[in-house]
């Protein structure tokens, strides 16, 4: 007979009360690192035309644009390796230490892009050095977003995880706005000729002081409550093992959590393809294909992104009330239905209609980004959360990162300006399947962690809800038993009379 593990009833002392001050510091530090990651993406996306001329001067404009965007996409090949590396270390040594390392690598590699001489100076080594810097970024970013989202999720109260997690992608959008704004400002001040000569380097130099600030904030943070609980549960022998070797079983991840892996991959693909299409490819699309000036296209995207900043936390707040799944499903349906109308407006050559088309895509994107950072960490238990999420996330981003290059190639090869819309419709189907099949995670404790609350009163309410849920399950079981008793009685009455 199997021995069942004795289960202790949960008490008020088992509920983790989250310190507001520590929570604010965690969100600030995590969001700043994410902002710096997307600052680079924003800068790179908006100076792609300049980089094409600096590093690929012999090609025609279309090839220059595709080559520059390809350099943006290639580092995504290295991100899964970074995700696996930092994911294992994050589950082994903790989240805080890894986030300090990733921001250092990211800021230094971004800064170094600004130091690379042009093709005219060092020839083929210029694009090679650019690619190496981008690959270093890709390696560090492989552990950045997943680590930051886990850090915020493990610090957040269960009832506010959606709202708190939404600030992570608020940082992404803010970083993008800052990067794009810096490009426009410098380009306007120094003029296009000077910008191509040396002005494009300045935005990359800004990454270093941002990285120093981020490192200071992250270094001062404490480890997350959920990971600390995991360590505290280990016996001394296991504690030593945690320091000496990884406790991550990729067999367990692949066999026991494959549904969560697929849900994670689907959600990240839907979110990031839309993200890169709108925020990285659209500036090039507007300038190269629709012949708007670079500054004009950038200003439209910046205005859209500023609007997204206000919508982002609202989506997170609403997801705490209505759940994460409705937003994924609603966003996917809207993306499928509105992709073609949005691009018809974008191709109208009327500034107001262009803005309306981009705004439609932006609101749809907010449906995904508002819930992603709170949804993904809740799919996996504490002891494998970083490794599993980093692996799934970066495999997905590997696909999504090809979006700018693939979209540019599709438009150039087909001469059909609606190709990006068709691409988004395919992605919308993936998002819809994911939203329908994924489990709801809102207002529930993270797997492998005790409930988390903002204060004692909320902790008592959580215990009350837990009690009511158990009572409801008991009632359901009693009902099932009663129905089985009725079925049993009917079967007994149907016994054939073999003694007559």
Swiss-Prot record:
> What residue ranges lie in the Cytoplasmic compartment?
1-37, 87-97, 143-169, 216-260, 319-325, 372-390, 438-500
Disulphide bonds in the chain: none
- GO (cellular component) term, any one: plasma membrane
Asked whether the keyword DNA-binding is assigned, the reply is no
Q: Does the keyword GTP-binding apply?
A: no
Q: Which residues lie on this side of the membrane: Periplasmic?
A: 59-65, 119-121, 191-194, 282-297, 347-350, 412-416
What's one GO MF term for it?
symporter activity
- Coiled coil located at which positions? 453-498
Q: What is its main location?
A: membrane
Matching InterPro entries:
H+-coupled_symporters, MFS_dom, MFS_sugar_transport-like, MFS_trans_sf, MHS_symport, Osmo_CC, ProP_C, Sugar_transporter_CS
Per the UniProt record, which residue ranges are transmembrane?
38-58, 66-86, 98-118, 122-142, 170-190, 195-215, 261-281, 298-318, 326-346, 351-371, 391-411, 417-437
Q: Where is this gene product found?
A: Cell inner membrane
Q: Which UniProt keywords apply?
A: Cell inner membrane, Cell membrane, Coiled coil, Membrane, Symport, Transmembrane, Transmembrane helix, Transport
Q: How the protein sits in the membrane? A: Multi-pass membrane protein
What exactly does this protein do? Proton symporter that senses osmotic shifts and responds by importing osmolytes such as proline, glycine betaine, stachydrine, pipecolic acid, ectoine and taurine. It is both an osmosensor and an osmoregulator which is available to participate early in the bacterial osmoregulatory response.
Homology family: Belongs to the major facilitator superfamily. Metabolite:H+ Symporter (MHS) family (TC 2.A.1.6) family.
Protein name listed in UniProt? Proline/betaine transporter
